[in-house]
């Protein structure tokens, strides 16, 4: 089963499987490599180590796609913006506050992003041909929120106040990030990625008018630009937390695949699969429970999504405390499931 076609095809009635953050802290082999590197960003730019951890979940679980080990904040970092990752705290960034701050952003990225593209090339070379390779970037809006807030996981009042009060400057920053995101994704495709994903982790914090301006419009621009060069590359979008605005997103954004968060009803996911391929949406916390619950939840999703354009995934990233044996059980449940 592969994720190589557009739209993604099913084989033997079984959906393809991969998991967000499948290369990560829940794997002991990942932690062994992580301990060898001083900081997280250095890890993201280390060609050999990033390649190794990208391949780890493929070797262990046989997922149908690998996703490059990287981070959405390598883009602003490579463009000269101050970004750091603190243990047990997360990302810390210089705050973008005024037009003057554009002087800290370079028009051309330094050689840091070249390391990312080397990782893509090396992974593609070592990955089984039948396994797809997903390149990715953060959405312009989500990357912008980190730059405006100076850190992650806030209530986003700083970002929202900024875009309400500084419409022209907010648009200028959004456009800058959008253009750089397009180049970053295209370069990943040129390096060997055959699927692209746009992570919009904070799409769900915006009201409808701002959602259109800061989520829908830049995503449309990115997709149009990529398709101009690579019309057959499938693009996955993920407007996490968008709720009812998922439908507006689907109406306006020409996405090939849409990732669904756990709060969207399965019947909606089933309905949307008539228009696009849907991906999701198991709650990651389910993998912290027991096999009985895991099997029950997986079977419910599979029964509803039978014969639909569907990729099995979580509704968000796998949690660090997830037992690897539960992930192994998830894969087993999906591959052994018998449709009625």
From Swiss-Prot:
Belongs to the uroporphyrinogen decarboxylase family. It comes from the Bacteria. Catalyzes the decarboxylation of four acetate groups of uroporphyrinogen-III to yield coproporphyrinogen-III. It is found in: Cytoplasm. It comes from Rickettsia bellii (strain OSU 85-389). Its EC number is 4.1.1.37. It catalyses: uroporphyrinogen III + 4 H(+) = coproporphyrinogen III + 4 CO2. GO terms for cellular component: cytosol. This is Uroporphyrinogen decarboxylase. Pathway: Porphyrin-containing compound metabolism; protoporphyrin-IX biosynthesis; coproporphyrinogen-III from 5-aminolevulinate: step 4/4. GO terms for molecular function: uroporphyrinogen decarboxylase activity. The record marks 71 as: Transition state stabilizer. Keywords: Cytoplasm, Decarboxylase, Lyase, Porphyrin biosynthesis. HAMAP family: URO_D. Substrate binds at residues 21-25, 71, 146, 201, 316. The keyword Cytoplasm applies. One of its GO terms (biological process) is protoporphyrinogen IX biosynthetic process. Its main location: cytoplasm. Homodimer. The gene is hemE.
